[in-house]
């Protein structure tokens, strides 16, 4: 009924009882296909609402790399920013050119939850951000270091979600 390309998006929006029901009736292959398409944070949200036997079934049907990343997100305190963040975003280096950045987005963007804002990182530390609009409208030879916005508002993964909400409201981030 639903094209495979949209199934994970539809599944992620379902209520937890419907998700639980479907996980129970899916074949192993159907479950693997779904889990391969679900974004990591959606998988974590699913696991938090399922009984232990279904959690085990899901974890058995994801590859070890994804399982490790899931466990990492599950270890954040329930009310922390880390428990609701996405880890599937476009990250770039400061010496990357616009042309290289666009090629990187074309190559990896399909697997990212968000491509509208790209994060410039060095040694896992946030240096700045650039938007997709910036990349599409700037000269191909400019580097991220030349383009990136460095006056950014950031929080720790352990920051309480309420505080994150206050910052979003204060700075009009939604």
Provide a role label for each language-model segment:
Residues 1-174:
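Hydrophobic packing positions in regular secondary-structure scaffolds
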């Amino acid at each position: 009924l639903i094209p495979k390309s949209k199934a994970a998006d539809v599944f992620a929006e379902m209520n937890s009882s419907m998700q639980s029901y479907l996980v129970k009736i899916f074949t192993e292959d159907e479950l693997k296909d779904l889990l391969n398409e679900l974004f990591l944070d959606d998988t974590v949200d699913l696991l938090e609402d399922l009984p232990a036997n279904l959690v085990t079934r899901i974890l058995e049907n994801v590859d070890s790399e994804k399982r490790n990343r899931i466990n990492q997100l599950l270890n954040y305190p329930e009310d922390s920013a880390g428990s609701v963040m996405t880890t599937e975003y476009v990250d770039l280096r400061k010496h990357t050119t616009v042309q290289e950045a666009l090629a990187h987005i074309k190559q990896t963007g399909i697997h990212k939850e968000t491509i509208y804002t790209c994060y410039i990182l060095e040694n896992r530390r946030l240096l700045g951000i650039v938007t997709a609009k910036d990349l599409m409208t700037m000269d191909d030879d400019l580097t991220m270091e030349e383009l990136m916005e460095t006056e950014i508002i950031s929080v720790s993964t352990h920051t309480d979600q309420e505080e994150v909400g206050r910052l979003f409201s204060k700075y009009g981030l939604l």
